[in-house]
C-alpha cells in the first residue's frame, strides 16, 4: 500500500543541507500504527513479528515499567510541563489484537488522560505554526541525527528524519518544509528510517526500541 504522499517538491527526496540528508514523509492517520513491546526489541524483531515494511523510531518512553524505560507515564501525566506529548488513543501490542488507528492532537498540549498510549519527546518545535523557544545548550546545539513528528492538517502526520541537524535550527527548517506542529522525538543514535523494506537511514550498529511508528 502506497501511503507516502508528496508534501512539496522535495518530499521523499534526499536534500543536502550542509552535507546532511533529510527526509519528509506524509502519512494518512488511518494508515499509521504504533507498536509497543515488552522491553526493548530490535528492528528485525518488529519486521518479523508484525511484517513491518515502514517504520521509524518513536518515543523516549512507553507506558511499560521495565528497565531504563520504566517511566514515567503516570508521572508525566501528573506533571504535564515536563514533556510535550502526542496523545495516541489506540495501539498494537505484541499479545493482543488492538485497534490500529491513532488520533493526532495537533495542539501538542496535555494529553487525553484516557489515552491508552502516549508518545513523549522534547522539545516542542512548532505549535500552531509558531516557532517555540528552544534553550541553547549542549543538547540543542549539537548537530546530530534527529527524528521529528508533526503535522500540517488533521488528516495526516508528518515524519522528519535528518542525518545531522541542530535542534535550534529545526523551527525555521520545519516551517519551510510545511510543518504546522512539530515535536522532537528520540534521536541521535536511535534515529532510524526503514521504508519499503529498505533501511533508508540507520546507524552502523542498530539499537533496540521500546516502541516504533509504522505504516
Give residue ranges: language-model regions.
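Positively charged n-region of N-terminal signal peptides that target proteins for export
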Residues: 1-3
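Gly/Ser/Thr/Pro-rich low-complexity, intrinsically disordered segments
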Residues: 8-215
Amino acid at each position: 500500500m502506497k501511503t507516502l504522499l508528496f508534501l512539496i517538491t522535495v518530499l521523499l527526496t534526499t536534500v543536502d543541507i550542509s552535507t546532511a540528508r533529510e527526509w519528509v514523509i506524509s502519512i494518512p492517520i488511518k494508515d499509521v500504527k504504533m507498536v509497543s513491546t515488552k522491553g526493548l526489541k530490535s528492528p528485525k524483531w518488529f519486521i518479523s513479528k508484525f511484517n513491518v515494511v515502514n517504520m521509524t523510531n518513536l518515543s523516549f518512553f512507553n507506558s511499560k515499567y521495565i528497565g531504563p524505560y520504566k517511566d514515567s507515564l503516570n508521572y508525566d501525566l501528573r506533571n504535564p510541563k515536563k514533556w510535550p506529548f502526542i496523545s495516541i488513543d489506540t495501539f498494537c501490542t505484541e499479545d493482543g489484537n488492538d485497534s490500529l488507528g491513532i488520533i493526532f492532537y495537533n495542539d501538542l498540549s496535555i494529553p487525553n488522560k484516557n489515552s491508552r498510549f502516549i508518545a513523549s519527546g522534547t522539545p516542542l518545535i512548532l505549535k500552531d505554526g509558531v516557532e517555540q523557544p528552544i534553550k541553547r545548550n549542549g543538547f540543542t546545539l549539537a548537530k546530530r541525527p534527529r527524528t521529528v513528528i508533526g503535522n500540517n492538517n488533521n488528516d495526516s502526520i508528518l515524519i522528519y528524519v535528518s542525518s545531522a541537524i541542530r535542534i535550534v535550527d529545526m523551527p525555521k527548517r520545519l516551517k519551510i518544509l510545511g510543518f504546522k506542529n512539530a515535536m522532537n522525538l528520540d534521536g541521535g543514535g536511535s534515529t532510524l528510517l526503514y521504508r519499503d523494506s529498505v533501511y533508508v537511514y540507520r546507524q552502523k550498529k542498530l539499537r533496540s526500541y521500546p516502541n516504533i511508528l509504522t505504516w
